[in-house]
Amino acid sequence: MTTPEILIYHHPDPQSSLLPLLRAHLPHSVPLLRRIQHGLAYPSPTAAVLATFPATTTLPSTTEPWLAAHVDLFRGRETQIYIYSSLEREASSPPASAAGVDSDFVSTFGDRISMDKQARTRDQLLAFLAYVKANLLPEYLSSPKAAAAADNPPSPSPSTPGTGSGTGTPVKKIPPPPPTAFLIGSMHTGLATLLTASGTDYSDPQTLPGVRIIRRDDPPYVKYLFRPEAYRLPSTGTDNDNTTSDKDKDRDEAPERRRHPLPPGYRFHDRRGRYGVQPHHHALVSSRTHIPRSSETLARMPGVAVYYDGDDKPNPNSSQTHDGLEGEEEMPIAWAFLGVDGSLATLHVEPAHRGRGIGACVSREAMRSGFRAGGIFRSRSRSRSLGEEEGEGEGEGELGHTDVLVTNRASRRVMEKLGGEIGWTDTWVVVELEG
Protein backbone atom coordinates (compact mmCIF):
# COMPACT_ATOMS: atom_id res chain seq x y z
CA MET A 1 0.00 0.00 0.00
CA THR A 2 1.44 3.37 -1.05
CA THR A 3 1.93 5.88 1.74
CA PRO A 4 0.20 9.18 0.90
CA GLU A 5 2.50 12.10 0.24
CA ILE A 6 2.74 14.53 3.13
CA LEU A 7 1.89 18.09 2.18
CA ILE A 8 2.03 21.18 4.37
CA TYR A 9 -0.78 23.73 4.06
CA HIS A 10 -1.12 27.34 5.16
CA HIS A 11 -4.15 28.27 7.29
CA PRO A 12 -4.64 32.02 6.71
CA ASP A 13 -7.84 32.02 8.78
CA PRO A 14 -7.07 29.63 11.66
CA GLN A 15 -9.91 31.03 13.73
CA SER A 16 -12.28 29.22 11.39
CA SER A 17 -10.23 26.36 9.99
CA LEU A 18 -8.18 25.22 12.98
CA LEU A 19 -9.31 26.55 16.36
CA PRO A 20 -12.48 24.42 16.52
CA LEU A 21 -10.36 21.30 15.99
CA LEU A 22 -7.81 22.34 18.58
CA ARG A 23 -10.59 23.00 21.09
CA ALA A 24 -11.80 19.45 20.52
CA HIS A 25 -8.31 18.27 21.55
CA LEU A 26 -8.11 20.25 24.79
CA PRO A 27 -6.38 20.13 27.18
CA HIS A 28 -3.55 18.57 25.16
CA SER A 29 -3.62 21.26 22.46
CA VAL A 30 -3.71 24.22 24.85
CA PRO A 31 -0.22 25.67 24.08
CA LEU A 32 -0.85 25.87 20.33
CA LEU A 33 -4.46 27.01 20.77
CA ARG A 34 -3.39 29.87 23.03
CA ARG A 35 -0.46 30.81 20.75
CA ILE A 36 -2.77 31.16 17.77
CA GLN A 37 -5.26 33.17 19.84
CA HIS A 38 -2.46 35.51 20.87
CA GLY A 39 -1.43 35.82 17.23
CA LEU A 40 -4.97 36.79 16.28
CA ALA A 41 -4.92 39.56 18.89
CA TYR A 42 -1.45 40.72 17.88
CA PRO A 43 -0.97 39.80 14.20
CA SER A 44 2.55 39.44 12.87
CA PRO A 45 3.28 39.76 9.14
CA THR A 46 6.04 37.16 9.49
CA ALA A 47 3.93 34.51 11.25
CA ALA A 48 2.33 31.49 9.60
CA VAL A 49 -0.10 28.82 10.79
CA LEU A 50 0.58 25.49 9.11
CA ALA A 51 -0.99 22.03 9.17
CA THR A 52 -0.80 18.68 7.40
CA PHE A 53 -4.35 19.14 6.11
CA PRO A 54 -5.89 21.91 4.00
CA ALA A 55 -7.94 24.80 5.34
CA THR A 56 -11.24 23.49 4.01
CA THR A 57 -14.53 22.40 5.47
CA THR A 58 -13.29 18.81 5.67
CA LEU A 59 -11.71 17.91 8.98
CA PRO A 60 -8.85 15.40 9.03
CA SER A 61 -9.62 11.72 9.47
CA THR A 62 -10.04 10.59 13.04
CA THR A 63 -7.72 7.64 12.35
CA GLU A 64 -4.99 9.49 10.44
CA PRO A 65 -2.53 11.45 12.61
CA TRP A 66 -2.25 15.15 11.86
CA LEU A 67 -0.01 18.00 12.87
CA ALA A 68 -0.45 21.78 13.19
CA ALA A 69 1.89 24.60 14.16
CA HIS A 70 2.35 28.34 14.63
CA VAL A 71 5.63 29.57 13.15
CA ASP A 72 7.31 32.96 13.42
CA LEU A 73 11.05 32.64 12.84
CA PHE A 74 11.46 36.40 13.20
CA ARG A 75 11.05 36.07 16.96
CA GLY A 76 14.75 35.16 16.89
CA ARG A 77 15.87 34.47 20.46
CA GLU A 78 12.30 33.90 21.62
CA THR A 79 10.26 30.77 20.92
CA GLN A 80 9.76 30.51 17.17
CA ILE A 81 7.52 27.45 16.80
CA TYR A 82 4.65 25.91 18.74
CA ILE A 83 3.55 22.55 17.38
CA TYR A 84 0.83 20.01 18.18
CA SER A 85 0.32 16.44 16.98
CA SER A 86 -2.97 14.61 17.34
CA LEU A 87 -1.02 11.68 18.82
CA GLU A 88 -0.42 13.71 21.95
CA ARG A 89 -3.99 13.05 23.04
CA GLU A 90 -3.21 9.33 22.99
CA ALA A 91 0.19 9.58 24.68
CA SER A 92 1.03 8.11 28.04
CA SER A 93 0.03 10.09 31.09
CA PRO A 94 2.10 9.99 34.26
CA PRO A 95 1.35 6.84 36.24
CA ALA A 96 -0.40 7.26 39.55
CA SER A 97 2.91 6.65 41.32
CA ALA A 98 4.45 9.61 39.45
CA ALA A 99 1.58 12.04 39.86
CA GLY A 100 3.37 14.07 42.51
CA VAL A 101 6.43 16.17 43.16
CA ASP A 102 8.66 13.33 44.36
CA SER A 103 8.66 11.29 41.16
CA ASP A 104 10.22 11.86 37.77
CA PHE A 105 8.63 10.71 34.54
CA VAL A 106 8.72 11.41 30.83
CA SER A 107 5.59 11.28 28.68
CA THR A 108 6.05 9.08 25.62
CA PHE A 109 3.92 7.67 22.84
CA GLY A 110 4.95 4.18 24.02
CA ASP A 111 3.02 1.00 23.37
CA ARG A 112 -0.40 2.66 23.45
CA ILE A 113 0.09 4.03 19.93
CA SER A 114 0.84 1.79 16.98
CA MET A 115 4.26 1.95 15.38
CA ASP A 116 2.60 2.78 12.06
CA LYS A 117 0.99 5.89 13.55
CA GLN A 118 4.24 6.90 15.20
CA ALA A 119 6.13 6.44 11.94
CA ARG A 120 3.55 8.52 10.09
CA THR A 121 3.78 11.27 12.69
CA ARG A 122 7.57 11.24 12.50
CA ASP A 123 7.33 11.66 8.73
CA GLN A 124 4.88 14.54 9.21
CA LEU A 125 7.24 16.22 11.65
CA LEU A 126 10.19 15.89 9.27
CA ALA A 127 8.08 17.15 6.36
CA PHE A 128 7.01 20.15 8.43
CA LEU A 129 10.60 21.02 9.41
CA ALA A 130 11.72 20.62 5.80
CA TYR A 131 8.92 22.93 4.64
CA VAL A 132 9.86 25.61 7.16
CA LYS A 133 13.52 25.36 6.15
CA ALA A 134 12.77 25.59 2.42
CA ASN A 135 9.98 28.17 2.45
CA LEU A 136 10.23 30.32 5.58
CA LEU A 137 13.88 30.24 6.64
CA PRO A 138 15.39 32.03 3.59
CA GLU A 139 13.43 35.23 4.23
CA TYR A 140 14.46 35.21 7.87
CA LEU A 141 18.14 34.60 7.08
CA SER A 142 18.16 37.53 4.67
CA SER A 143 16.81 39.89 7.33
CA PRO A 144 18.88 42.03 9.71
CA LYS A 145 17.04 40.44 12.63
CA ALA A 146 18.65 37.03 12.07
CA ALA A 147 22.13 38.48 12.34
CA ALA A 148 21.19 40.64 15.30
CA ALA A 149 19.72 37.70 17.23
CA ALA A 150 22.89 35.66 16.80
CA ASP A 151 25.59 38.33 17.07
CA ASN A 152 24.12 40.87 19.46
CA PRO A 153 22.25 39.12 22.27
CA PRO A 154 20.55 41.50 24.71
CA SER A 155 22.47 42.45 27.82
CA PRO A 156 21.82 40.13 30.79
CA SER A 157 21.91 43.11 33.15
CA PRO A 158 19.66 46.03 32.19
CA SER A 159 20.46 49.25 34.03
CA THR A 160 17.99 48.57 36.79
CA PRO A 161 18.98 48.61 40.48
CA GLY A 162 19.32 45.24 42.16
CA THR A 163 19.52 43.01 39.10
CA GLY A 164 19.61 39.27 39.47
CA SER A 165 17.83 37.30 42.15
CA GLY A 166 18.04 40.10 44.66
CA THR A 167 21.81 39.68 45.00
CA GLY A 168 23.04 42.18 42.41
CA THR A 169 24.23 39.35 40.17
CA PRO A 170 22.90 39.55 36.60
CA VAL A 171 20.81 36.61 35.42
CA LYS A 172 22.53 34.94 32.49
CA LYS A 173 20.26 34.64 29.48
CA ILE A 174 19.71 31.45 27.52
CA PRO A 175 22.03 31.57 24.50
CA PRO A 176 20.40 32.28 21.14
CA PRO A 177 19.87 29.42 18.69
CA PRO A 178 21.90 29.48 15.47
CA PRO A 179 20.00 31.41 12.77
CA THR A 180 19.60 28.22 10.73
CA ALA A 181 18.04 26.31 13.63
CA PHE A 182 14.50 26.46 15.04
CA LEU A 183 13.53 27.04 18.67
CA ILE A 184 10.44 24.91 19.32
CA GLY A 185 8.61 25.57 22.58
CA SER A 186 6.39 23.46 24.82
CA MET A 187 7.03 20.44 22.60
CA HIS A 188 5.54 17.20 23.92
CA THR A 189 8.38 14.86 24.89
CA GLY A 190 6.75 12.04 22.95
CA LEU A 191 6.87 14.13 19.78
CA ALA A 192 10.45 15.25 20.46
CA THR A 193 11.47 11.62 21.00
CA LEU A 194 10.49 10.81 17.41
CA LEU A 195 13.51 12.86 16.31
CA THR A 196 15.89 10.47 18.10
CA ALA A 197 17.42 7.41 16.46
CA SER A 198 15.59 5.03 18.81
CA GLY A 199 12.26 6.83 18.53
CA THR A 200 11.44 5.64 22.04
CA ASP A 201 14.12 7.05 24.37
CA TYR A 202 13.79 10.77 25.02
CA SER A 203 17.40 11.00 26.28
CA ASP A 204 18.87 9.15 23.28
CA PRO A 205 21.86 11.29 22.14
CA GLN A 206 21.63 9.87 18.63
CA THR A 207 19.22 11.58 16.24
CA LEU A 208 17.65 10.72 12.93
CA PRO A 209 19.90 11.15 9.87
CA GLY A 210 19.93 14.80 8.80
CA VAL A 211 18.55 16.03 12.14
CA ARG A 212 20.67 17.87 14.67
CA ILE A 213 19.31 18.54 18.15
CA ILE A 214 21.41 21.42 19.44
CA ARG A 215 19.65 21.83 22.76
CA ARG A 216 16.78 20.26 24.69
CA ASP A 217 15.66 20.13 28.29
CA ASP A 218 16.83 16.92 29.92
CA PRO A 219 15.20 16.40 32.34
CA PRO A 220 12.13 17.98 30.71
CA TYR A 221 9.40 20.19 32.11
CA VAL A 222 6.16 19.10 33.75
CA LYS A 223 3.04 20.58 32.20
CA TYR A 224 0.59 21.68 34.91
CA LEU A 225 -3.01 22.42 34.00
CA PHE A 226 -5.23 24.85 35.92
CA ARG A 227 -8.99 24.56 35.77
CA PRO A 228 -10.87 27.81 36.41
CA GLU A 229 -11.69 26.69 39.95
CA ALA A 230 -7.99 26.99 40.81
CA TYR A 231 -7.91 30.77 40.38
CA ARG A 232 -11.48 32.08 40.29
CA LEU A 233 -12.55 34.37 43.09
CA PRO A 234 -15.04 32.84 45.52
CA SER A 235 -18.54 33.99 44.73
CA THR A 236 -20.15 36.52 47.04
CA GLY A 237 -23.56 35.84 45.62
CA THR A 238 -24.00 39.53 44.86
CA ASP A 239 -22.70 39.87 41.31
CA ASN A 240 -20.60 38.23 38.65
CA ASP A 241 -17.23 38.29 40.37
CA ASN A 242 -15.21 37.09 37.40
CA THR A 243 -16.19 39.73 34.86
CA THR A 244 -15.41 43.38 34.43
CA SER A 245 -17.55 46.28 33.33
CA ASP A 246 -17.58 47.21 29.64
CA LYS A 247 -15.64 50.34 30.51
CA ASP A 248 -12.91 48.35 32.25
CA LYS A 249 -12.46 45.67 29.59
CA ASP A 250 -10.35 47.93 27.40
CA ARG A 251 -8.51 49.67 30.24
CA ASP A 252 -5.76 47.52 31.73
CA GLU A 253 -5.06 50.22 34.32
CA ALA A 254 -8.66 50.39 35.57
CA PRO A 255 -9.14 48.85 39.02
CA GLU A 256 -11.56 45.94 39.04
CA ARG A 257 -14.11 45.39 41.74
CA ARG A 258 -12.52 42.35 43.38
CA ARG A 259 -9.11 40.71 43.30
CA HIS A 260 -7.34 37.91 45.10
CA PRO A 261 -6.47 39.04 48.63
CA LEU A 262 -2.87 39.92 49.44
CA PRO A 263 -1.19 40.08 52.86
CA PRO A 264 -1.53 43.42 54.66
CA GLY A 265 0.67 46.12 53.19
CA TYR A 266 0.62 44.72 49.65
CA ARG A 267 -1.50 45.84 46.71
CA PHE A 268 -2.11 45.09 43.03
CA HIS A 269 -1.92 48.74 41.95
CA ASP A 270 0.75 51.41 42.22
CA ARG A 271 0.32 54.68 44.09
CA ARG A 272 -1.24 56.20 41.00
CA GLY A 273 -3.90 53.50 40.95
CA ARG A 274 -2.52 51.71 37.88
CA TYR A 275 -3.11 47.96 37.69
CA GLY A 276 -0.78 45.56 35.87
CA VAL A 277 2.83 45.65 34.75
CA GLN A 278 3.80 49.04 33.29
CA PRO A 279 6.31 49.65 30.45
CA HIS A 280 8.88 51.16 32.82
CA HIS A 281 8.90 47.84 34.74
CA HIS A 282 10.13 45.81 31.76
CA ALA A 283 13.85 46.28 32.41
CA LEU A 284 13.43 45.11 36.00
CA VAL A 285 11.35 42.11 34.92
CA SER A 286 13.89 41.17 32.26
CA SER A 287 16.75 41.38 34.74
CA ARG A 288 15.19 38.70 36.94
CA THR A 289 14.82 35.92 34.35
CA HIS A 290 17.14 33.85 32.18
CA ILE A 291 14.54 33.80 29.39
CA PRO A 292 15.11 36.58 26.83
CA ARG A 293 11.97 38.57 26.11
CA SER A 294 11.85 41.96 24.44
CA SER A 295 9.96 44.89 25.92
CA GLU A 296 7.55 44.58 22.99
CA THR A 297 6.81 40.96 23.92
CA LEU A 298 6.31 41.80 27.61
CA ALA A 299 3.92 44.59 26.64
CA ARG A 300 1.79 42.04 24.79
CA MET A 301 1.70 39.53 27.65
CA PRO A 302 -1.10 40.02 30.21
CA GLY A 303 0.72 40.76 33.46
CA VAL A 304 0.03 41.53 37.12
CA ALA A 305 2.33 43.36 39.54
CA VAL A 306 2.39 43.59 43.35
CA TYR A 307 3.56 46.63 45.32
CA TYR A 308 4.57 46.97 48.96
CA ASP A 309 4.11 49.69 51.56
CA GLY A 310 3.41 47.63 54.66
CA ASP A 311 6.20 48.99 56.84
CA ASP A 312 6.13 52.53 55.44
CA LYS A 313 9.65 51.97 54.12
CA PRO A 314 10.24 52.20 50.37
CA ASN A 315 11.38 49.01 48.71
CA PRO A 316 14.83 49.24 47.04
CA ASN A 317 13.28 50.01 43.67
CA SER A 318 10.28 52.13 44.62
CA SER A 319 12.03 55.49 44.31
CA GLN A 320 13.52 54.78 40.90
CA THR A 321 12.14 55.40 37.46
CA HIS A 322 13.14 53.38 34.45
CA ASP A 323 15.57 56.16 33.51
CA GLY A 324 17.01 56.60 36.98
CA LEU A 325 15.17 59.76 38.06
CA GLU A 326 14.11 59.97 41.68
CA GLY A 327 10.63 59.81 43.13
CA GLU A 328 8.43 59.42 40.06
CA GLU A 329 7.65 55.76 39.50
CA GLU A 330 7.04 52.97 41.97
CA MET A 331 8.53 49.57 41.16
CA PRO A 332 6.86 46.24 42.02
CA ILE A 333 8.19 43.55 44.34
CA ALA A 334 6.44 40.67 42.54
CA TRP A 335 4.87 39.94 39.17
CA ALA A 336 3.50 37.22 36.92
CA PHE A 337 2.46 37.09 33.27
CA LEU A 338 0.59 34.90 30.84
CA GLY A 339 2.96 34.12 27.98
CA VAL A 340 2.19 34.21 24.27
CA ASP A 341 1.04 30.59 24.66
CA GLY A 342 -1.21 31.48 27.60
CA SER A 343 1.05 29.81 30.15
CA LEU A 344 1.77 31.23 33.59
CA ALA A 345 5.24 32.67 33.02
CA THR A 346 7.91 34.96 34.46
CA LEU A 347 6.61 34.49 38.01
CA HIS A 348 8.92 36.31 40.41
CA VAL A 349 8.87 37.49 44.02
CA GLU A 350 11.77 39.54 45.37
CA PRO A 351 13.68 37.57 48.06
CA ALA A 352 12.77 39.90 50.93
CA HIS A 353 9.07 39.21 50.34
CA ARG A 354 9.11 35.44 49.88
CA GLY A 355 7.46 32.99 52.25
CA ARG A 356 4.31 35.13 52.61
CA GLY A 357 2.12 33.50 49.97
CA ILE A 358 2.57 36.35 47.50
CA GLY A 359 3.64 34.02 44.69
CA ALA A 360 0.39 32.09 44.93
CA CYS A 361 -1.66 35.30 45.07
CA VAL A 362 -0.03 36.90 42.04
CA SER A 363 -0.26 33.62 40.08
CA ARG A 364 -3.99 33.30 40.69
CA GLU A 365 -4.56 36.96 39.91
CA ALA A 366 -2.57 36.74 36.66
CA MET A 367 -4.72 33.83 35.46
CA ARG A 368 -7.97 35.39 36.67
CA SER A 369 -7.18 38.66 34.93
CA GLY A 370 -5.65 37.09 31.81
CA PHE A 371 -8.57 34.75 31.18
CA ARG A 372 -11.27 37.32 31.87
CA ALA A 373 -14.23 37.59 29.52
CA GLY A 374 -13.31 39.64 26.49
CA GLY A 375 -9.57 38.98 26.88
CA ILE A 376 -7.27 37.78 24.11
CA PHE A 377 -7.53 34.14 25.22
CA ARG A 378 -11.33 34.14 25.35
CA SER A 379 -12.08 34.80 21.66
CA ARG A 380 -14.83 32.91 19.87
CA SER A 381 -14.64 31.52 16.37
CA ARG A 382 -16.97 30.60 13.56
CA SER A 383 -16.62 26.98 12.54
CA ARG A 384 -16.87 26.46 8.80
CA SER A 385 -17.65 22.79 9.24
CA LEU A 386 -20.54 23.50 11.59
CA GLY A 387 -21.67 26.76 10.00
CA GLU A 388 -22.37 28.31 13.37
CA GLU A 389 -20.54 30.14 16.09
CA GLU A 390 -18.26 27.81 17.98
CA GLY A 391 -16.95 28.91 21.36
CA GLU A 392 -15.16 27.15 24.18
CA GLY A 393 -17.16 24.85 26.36
CA GLU A 394 -17.65 25.54 30.02
CA GLY A 395 -14.25 26.34 31.50
CA GLU A 396 -12.28 25.52 28.35
CA GLY A 397 -11.66 29.17 27.50
CA GLU A 398 -10.23 29.65 30.98
CA LEU A 399 -7.92 26.63 31.01
CA GLY A 400 -4.52 27.71 32.29
CA HIS A 401 -1.19 25.95 32.19
CA THR A 402 2.47 26.32 33.10
CA ASP A 403 5.77 24.46 32.80
CA VAL A 404 8.04 23.52 35.70
CA LEU A 405 11.32 21.62 35.45
CA VAL A 406 10.82 18.03 36.60
CA THR A 407 13.58 18.37 39.21
CA ASN A 408 12.35 21.70 40.62
CA ARG A 409 10.53 20.23 43.61
CA ALA A 410 9.85 23.55 45.32
CA SER A 411 8.13 25.11 42.31
CA ARG A 412 6.21 21.92 41.62
CA ARG A 413 4.84 21.97 45.17
CA VAL A 414 3.72 25.57 44.66
CA MET A 415 1.92 24.66 41.44
CA GLU A 416 0.18 21.69 43.04
CA LYS A 417 -0.87 23.78 46.04
CA LEU A 418 -2.37 26.21 43.53
CA GLY A 419 -4.49 23.37 42.19
CA GLY A 420 -2.33 22.49 39.20
CA GLU A 421 -2.91 19.03 37.74
CA ILE A 422 -0.05 17.14 36.09
CA GLY A 423 -0.74 16.65 32.39
CA TRP A 424 2.42 15.54 30.60
CA THR A 425 6.05 16.50 30.08
CA ASP A 426 7.38 18.89 27.46
CA THR A 427 10.58 20.57 26.37
CA TRP A 428 12.13 23.49 24.53
CA VAL A 429 14.16 22.11 21.63
CA VAL A 430 16.63 23.77 19.28
CA VAL A 431 16.67 21.62 16.13
CA GLU A 432 18.40 22.02 12.79
CA LEU A 433 18.01 20.12 9.55
CA GLU A 434 21.39 19.43 7.98
CA GLY A 435 22.16 19.53 4.29
Which functions belong to the PLM regions below?
Residues 141-146, 151-154, 170-186, 370-405:
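Conserved GNAT acetyl-CoA-binding A-motif
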Residues 34-272, 427-434:
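Acyl-donor-binding surface of acyltransferase catalytic domains
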Residues 63-65, 329-334, 396:
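Glycine-rich acetyl-CoA-binding "A-motif" of GNAT/NAT acetyltransferases
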Residues 117-138, 355-372, 376-380, 413, ...:
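Conserved acetyl-CoA-binding loop-helix of GNAT-fold acetyltransferases
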Residues 292-312, 318-352:
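A conserved beta-strand-loop-helix scaffold within acyl/acetyltransferase catalytic domains
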Residues 2-33, 241-243, 249-294:
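Short amphipathic alpha-helix that is part of the acyltransferase structural core
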Residues 189-206, 374-397, 401-424:
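Conserved active-site alpha-helix within GNAT-family acetyltransferase domains
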